[in-house]
Amino acid sequence: ADQRFIWNSHALTELSQQPELSRFCLPMILGYVSVNSIKVNGKTLEYVLVSRRSIYRAGTRFNVRGLDLQGQAANFVETEQIVMHGSDVCSFVQTRGSIPLFWTQKANLKRLPNPVVMDIDHMQAFQKHFDQQVYVYGNQVIVNLINQDGPEQVLEKKLAQVVTNAQNENIRYEPFDFHKECKKMRWDRLSILMERLKPDMKKFGYFMELKGSVVKLQGGVFRTNCIDCLDRTNVVQSLIAKEILQEQLVKLGLLRSEKELQDQKAFDAIFKNVWADNADVISKEYAGTGALKTDFTRTGKRTLFGALMDGYNSVIRYVKNNFQDGSRQDAMDLFLGNYIVEENEGLTVKSPLESARDWKYYAVPVIFLVAFSMFMVSVLLPDEHLSEQMLYVLFWGMACFLTLATMLLFGAIFVDQPKLAQNKVKSD
């Protein structure tokens, strides 16, 4: 099994070291698996989608970003699309992974904290990352979907600079400002990106085995990212997968032309829902909610209801990313063996989980609750003297504003921060 994707490898360590017990070790992946039996023009085929999350630099949305010193990327996921018809098999692999630089985006109570590119040399880790990727998958096309203006601009400029300086003939860089190109729900403009990627699709090809003989091999992959490698990434990956799938079905003799797939309504519906479900699962594992923009993946168009659901999921993400993800990160680090509990920890040795909170963590929210309560009382309870009531409203309203401003100013104090492996790295 590929060690990059065995999530219970740490739990199996002692068993795997004993030859008589190693055969009982069952490797487990974290990701998404879907197997569907579908008919196309009266012929049955199996459509399979498998996504596997890497155990390296694993974690939650704002706690792990970019690369580590070994060149491992946060939220790295390998997705393989498999089609089986009788003894014939086709597959196509894509990857996603955090922007391959040293950067952070720490939760601080703001809806979207500004990303920060570290002022250190990125080249060595970048080259390590792509040396690994080229060795495993072949040539790489970096499909970068982040904004080319605003807070994300610093990441796009730095990545373009590093790719240029690397001068690696096995890597091609393809930036595409998803939000700018598709603003006002003009998602049909994604066809611009697909046209730019078609030469690479032809060049890379896909795996094909006919009657037990391998007739084609995939020569490279598309490594797609947005800032989270979730919502925009999944939309583009599903479009690339569909382009390849159409060609595969023609080669297998199941379709007469590539355009015919859109007429296979049942298959088209399953394809869209499988990719949307894949998006939701990968998103929940990293960001805590289902993916955004899945209405486009499911229906082929952007809808008002989908936009409203995106707003709802964004609120849930905000709460989880700021107030729950530290504990989730600690749980992952414990499970993966990134943090090893010391003997007598919590007894004679202090546990990192016992670290004390800053006094502001308790005082400021209490002050806000008191101020907000008094503000509501001042607004709702009538007073004989209107000017006096207005004075109370203004005073307690200002108190609410100042305490909220204080919470935002010291936002990192109020966020649920990881306490185990993350702190150990900092102390080292």
Q: Can you annotate each of these PLM segments?
A:
Residues 1-215, 244-428:
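Phosphoinositide system proteins, centered on phosphoinositide phosphatases
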Residues 220-239:
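A phosphate-binding catalytic loop at a beta-strand-loop-alpha-helix junction
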